[in-house]
């Protein structure tokens, strides 16, 4: 009984070893593939475009790139904001590639039902979202002045004069029609109101002008010579 248990315990690690080895090789291959893509982005070397490049060659490219960067940028030198932004973008791209590689490995080993469910969820997440509607103000809008051209305008009406009634004559013209009506033969200008105006004052004598002689007094009849 004890011998059988020991035999089963010995066979357990032997059965798990191929699976662990396979996972370890998959991790190495994914890391090397990511390293190849990063080196291709940085160096633009056409040899790195080959997806079946030898692992040793990928490692040699990585060592040469790091050695060259250490010569250009010695350690301890502060980096500029542009370099920090490039480093952040590179980290983001590398993380995105790592996620894609893990997703591809999971989809390859998953069942068809799980793969279909995963792709459906990804498709719904990556689908463009419709724009959100703007919030509606519950308060009613304020009334605006009418812009209808047929509506009466208020501006010109303020400058119009009140109409003059022509039915009854004015009291001034009631007793003297000749003062209000123009004379015959005139050029259309109204006659001056001579009956209502006071007589013009005598002309003032200018200083220094000679005085006019006074007329002689009238003769009176006397009984004596």
UniProtKB/Swiss-Prot annotation:
GO terms for cellular component: chromatin; nucleus. InterPro entries: bHLH_dom, HES-7_bHLH-O, HES_HEY, HLH_DNA-bd_sf, Orange_dom. Residues 212-225 have a biased composition (Pro residues). Its main location: nucleus. GO terms for molecular function: DNA binding; DNA-binding transcription factor activity, RNA polymerase II-specific; protein dimerization activity; RNA polymerase II cis-regulatory region sequence-specific DNA binding; sequence-specific double-stranded DNA binding. A motif (WRPW motif) lies at residues 221-224. Residues 12-69 form the bHLH domain. Has a particular type of basic domain which includes a helix-interrupting proline. The C-terminal WRPW motif is a transcriptional repression motif which is necessary for interaction with Groucho/TLE family members, transcriptional corepressors recruited to specific target DNA by Hairy-related proteins. It is linked to Spondylocostal dysostosis 4, autosomal recessive: A rare condition of variable severity characterized by vertebral and costal anomalies. The main feature include dwarfism, vertebral fusion, hemivertebrae, posterior rib fusion, reduced rib number, and other rib malformations. This is Transcription factor HES-7. It comes from Homo sapiens. The lineage of its organism: Eukaryota, Metazoa, Chordata, Craniata, Vertebrata.
């Amino acid at each position: 009984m004890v011998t059988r248990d020991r035999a089963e315990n010995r066979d357990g690690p032997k059965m798990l070893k191929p699976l662990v080895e396979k996972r370890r090789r998959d991790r190495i291959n994914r890391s090397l593939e990511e390293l190849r893509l990063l080196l291709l982005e940085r160096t633009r070397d056409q040899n790195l475009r080959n997806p079946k490049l030898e692992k040793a060659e990928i490692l040699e490219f990585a060592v040469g790139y790091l050695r060259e960067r250490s010569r250009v940028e010695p350690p301890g030198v502060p980096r500029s904001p542009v370099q920090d932004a490039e480093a952040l973008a590179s980290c983001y791209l590398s993380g995105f590639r790592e996620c894609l590689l893990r997703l591809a490995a999971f989809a390859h080993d998953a069942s068809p039902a799980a793969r279909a469910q995963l792709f459906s969820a990804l498709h719904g997440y990556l689908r463009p979202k419709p724009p959100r509607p703007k919030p509606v103000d519950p308060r009613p809008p304020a009334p605006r002045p009418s812009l209808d051209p047929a509506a009466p305008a208020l501006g010109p009406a303020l400058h119009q004069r009140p109409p003059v009634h022509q039915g009854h004559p004015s009291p001034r013209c009631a007793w003297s029609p000749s003062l209000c009506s123009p004379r015959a033969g005139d050029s259309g200008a109204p006659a001056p109101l001579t009956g209502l105006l006071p007589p013009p004052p005598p002309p003032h004598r200018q200083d220094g002008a000679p005085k006019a002689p006074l007329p002689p007094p009238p003769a009176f009849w006397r009984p004596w010579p």
